Every structure is written in structure tokens, then in C-alpha cells.
Amino acid sequence: TEGALYHALGDELSAYVESYSFTSLAETLLRRYGGAAVPTLSEAGRAVLVRRAMDEMMDKVVYYSRQRRSAAFCQKAAETISELKSAGIRPETLADYANAPGADKDKLGELALIFGTYETLLAQTAMDPGDRVELAAKSLDQAFFAGRTVYIDEFDTFNHSKRAMLAAMLPVADVTVSLCCDQAPDLADDGVFSGARRVANTLKSMAASAGVPCKEIRLTQDMRHKDAPVLAELGLLLADPTYTPEAEVDPAAPAITYYKADSRQAEAKAVAAAVKARARAGVPYNKMAVICRTVDQYLLQVRYEF
């Protein structure tokens, strides 16, 4: 990112721009406002802390009593706690849910106890990686962002700690978030871009809660594919089947073949045939790649055909 900024802005202007990830921004803020010296737990450290939490609970561990000595269980429990914290769920919230009608009270209730004990021990020793971002958001002086312009790119979701950082920016900074989205955010479906639309709606709600005006800008010029005009043409064609491509296509050697299949197996078979034809034409196998949107859904079919 730093290299791209320097290339675009040059020596003079690039000196006025700083590039951060949420993690590196959090570290900068913690060094300024305090908290940077607190160690961060590694994955192994989180699993060890889960084990310590269960030892602290002693005979309160009933549902998971058989797994309490299992390293694999402690690792899985640590991952679960990390996911809960990313979603902004606290131990008391999980405990309330455990008592809800239809919930697995024994399982979730005990997990809530483990989670709570884990958090108590954690506060005495270190921080989770996500906690550092949230702590930085809570401790910063709003003057840090005052008058700044913030651009956020290449995100399709924001967890609880990142939303806390965004909430700290919104009242004082001019914030722009770019999302890859094919329709207006208020159109709901389960398509490829539905997650981005949900994020857009969340950001709008956050802005409204902060009393900050929000403006939606739709970019129609395809800058991403300016060096790949064939892909740009394909994008326009997929968006509008009535679109007439500007470039002449040689039927004998198309740059892109768009194939409609009845099943994943048929997709894999067609791709395998295309790869075989390219290989016979002299293209080395190490110059070809097969890319699936979701590997787990296509792995069996691809392995069978290849």
C-alpha cells in the first residue's frame, strides 16, 4: 500500500499520507495513549489460558469435564471465545442466551462460565489481539482524528473491535469506506455481494447514531480492469445481457469463454477439457491455473476430473 501511495502521489504529497491496518493503527494509538506494553496472547497462549480457566473453576466444570485435559478442546474453546468476542458477545450475554427457551443450557451455560473466567485471568496477564483494537478505540483522544480524511478499502466486514474504532472516527473525521457491491445496499439477497450490502447498512446506521450525514457514491467506471479490457467487457456483459461489446471477438481464439453448466461436475469437466486442449496446443501446465470460488464445494469434482 505504501508503495502504491508513493507511486500515485510522489515525494511531496505522500509525506502527508499514512497507511495503517486496524492492528497497526491500534498499536500507534496504544503507544501514544498507553497500553502498548501489555503483552498479546498467541494462539497457544489463549489455549493455555482456557486450560487455566477450567482449572480455576474446578468442580464447576461438569458438561466439559471429560474434555478439560484435552489440548484440542482447549484450542477449540479458545477459537470459540475469539469468535464470540469478535461478534461483541460478552460472557454475561452468552449466559443470558443459555437460559433462553430452547437453548442448550448445560453446554452454553458452562461455556459462558469458562468464557468469564478466561476474561478474568486475561485481565491480569495480557490482551487478546482483538482487545488491543478495542482498547485503542476507547482510550484515544478524538483530537487524533480531528480534521483528518480517512479512507478504508479492501474490507467486506467489520467485527466488534473494528466497529468501535470506526465509531471513534465518525464524529471528527471525514471517513470514506469503499465496498465492492453490485446493487444498492437496501436490496437484500444471498448473493456474492450480500455481505457488502449488510456492511453498508451497518455503516449507515452507525453514522445516523452519531448524527453524521452519510452520502452514497456509486462508481460506474471500471478502473480495476483498465489494463484488462476483456475482463471489463465481460463485467459489462454480465451486468447487462443486452450490452454490445466494443471489441471484435475472434471465435477461434476468445480471450474468455463463458460456460453455463448444469452442475459442478459439468463445470469441472468443461474446465478439464479446456486445460487439456491448451496443453495439446503447447501451453505448459505450470502456466495454467484452476480457480474456484469455494474450494470445499468443488474439490471432489476437480479431483475426479483432473
What are these regions (language model features)?
Residues 2-7, 29-32, 160-167, 187-197, ...:
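A short acidic (Asp/Glu
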Residues 7-13, 167-171, 280, 303-306:
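Short, surface-exposed basic-aromatic patches at helix termini and helix-loop junctions that form
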Residues 140, 208-305:
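Helicase P-loop NTPase motor core
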Residues 1, 21-23, 179-183, 220-221, ...:
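A short beta-strand-to-loop transition that corresponds to the Sensor-1 phosphate-sensing loop
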Residues 42-46, 93-209, 214-219, 260-266:
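Conserved helicase NTPase motor core
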Residues 149, 153, 171-176, 249, ...:
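C-terminal RecA-like lobe
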Residues 1-95, 99-102, 106:
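Conserved P-loop NTPase-based nucleic-acid remodeling module centered on helicase motor cores
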